[in-house]
């Protein structure tokens, strides 16, 4: 039975009640419950998100700026979505930009900032990153005669080699692009420290918060970030891209726009064409769903409270999983494996199985009603650095706040039978 989970902070999450918000979690395959360990590739969605999107389409489906009721209601919903995104990212509403997805925003913003740089200027990326925070820099570098350097990860534990990153910094460094959490193996690098290093040479701190956001609360201002991007479909919302851009940058970078388009708010300058109003409404509902798991007088306070409980629940699942699999000699794990260092990782694990191709393992687990991913997960640099690419990559499992201890036990048992 799925029970209430208690936390040291006094907060608790009734996991059964949480799961009731997600119709997909009641799915069965061949008579057995279906376990979603595929969260690193996209989360499930609560009913309130689908309801908000449906309401937007059926009752407030109009473009912006009109004098009539549906347009006025649509404008209000868009304003609220900017505030919700700001509350979620720890920034201000006028710093928010929306697009179809985060990769699209990465390319759009990279091309914008590249127009402010000089030939020979340098950009630093890391081997921990999803390729959407690497490839766009390689492409704008080729277009603008820039230089891209890449900070290494430690092969032993999947952490970022900060000494190597520091050695790459110079007066020519203009952007340090890094992830807040590895979508491959869950590593959480020290964001505020990296941002300070970037700022010490006058560079921007540009962070991919996509994988971090379902596990820990984003805070662009507290982390010292200049640009932060995230994707609601990783944290129980719809497919959408969000960027939080420091106001002076959002207001000044060149933006590709049609002539009649508004220049305010600042983040809106990067929103080409009509956005998905229904996805924005769904995103607001996802933020409010998460905030509803916590307590406080403001949305941000409720989010902070909720994420304390979410982190505690996921940390317990991660430790349960590791205690169950660490003695299995046929499994080889990548990333942090010392429980004393689990504060520096989220509940995402990648591994290989001796003598089995990752796709075969994923298929065998799928037959047992478990969703897992295999491959490189678009974290190509990490897959290459770890020597995994030629062998088909790795298997990846992830736990979210709706994952139960019973599901983790099922996974442990299934992995044990692969040996």
Locations of the language-model features?
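Pyridoxal 5′-phosphate
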Residues: 2-419
């Amino acid at each position: 039975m799925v029970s209430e989970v208690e936390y040291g902070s006094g907060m608790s999450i009734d996991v059964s009640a949480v799961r009731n918000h997600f119709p997909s979690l009641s799915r069965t395959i061949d008579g057995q419950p279906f376990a979603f360990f595929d969260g690193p590739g996209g989360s499930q969605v609560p009913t309130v998100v689908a309801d908000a999107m449906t309401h937007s389409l059926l009752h407030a489906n109009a473009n912006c700026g009109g004098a009539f009721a549906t347009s006025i209601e649509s404008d209000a919903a868009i304003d609220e979505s900017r505030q919700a995104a700001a509350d979620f990212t720890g920034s201000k509403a006028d710093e928010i930009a929306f697009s179809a997805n985060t990769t699209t925003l990465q390319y759009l913003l990279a091309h914008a900032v590249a127009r402010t740089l000089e030939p020979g200027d340098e950009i630093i990326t890391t081997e921990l990153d999803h390729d959407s925070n690497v490839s766009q820099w390689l492409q704008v570098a080729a277009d603008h005669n820039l230089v891209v350097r890449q900070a290494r990860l430690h092969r032993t534990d999947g952490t970022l080699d900060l000494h190597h990153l520091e050695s790459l910094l110079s007066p020519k460094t203009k952007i340090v692009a890094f992830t807040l959490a590895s979508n491959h193996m869950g590593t959480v690098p020290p964001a505020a420290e990296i941002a300070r290093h970037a700022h010490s040479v006058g560079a921007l701190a540009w962070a991919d918060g996509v994988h971090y956001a379902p596990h820990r609360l984003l805070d662009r201002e507290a982390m010292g970030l200049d640009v932060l991007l995230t994707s609601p479909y990783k944290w129980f919302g719809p497919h959408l891209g969000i960027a939080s851009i420091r106001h002076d940058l959002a207001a000044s970078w060149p933006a590709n726009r049609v002539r009649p388009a508004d220049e305010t708010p600042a983040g809106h300058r990067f929103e080409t064409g009509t956005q998905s109003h229904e996805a924005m409404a769904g995103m607001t509902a996802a933020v409010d769903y998460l905030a509803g798991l916590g307590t406080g007088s403001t949305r941000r306070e409720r989010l902070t409270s909720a994420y304390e409980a979410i982190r505690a629940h996921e940390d317990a699942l991660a430790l349960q999983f590791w205690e169950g699999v660490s003695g299995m000699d046929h499994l080889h794990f990548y990333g942090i494996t010392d429980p004393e260092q689990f504060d520096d990782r989220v509940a995402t694990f990648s591994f290989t199985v001796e003598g089995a191709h990752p796709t075969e393992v994923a298929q065998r687990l799928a037959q047992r009603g478990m969703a897992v991913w295999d491959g490189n997960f678009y974290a190509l640099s990490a897959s290459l650095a770890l020597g995994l690419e030629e062998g088909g990559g790795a298997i990846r499992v992830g736990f979210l706040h709706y994952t139960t201890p019973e599901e983790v036990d099922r996974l442990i048992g299934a992995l044990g039978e692969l040996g």
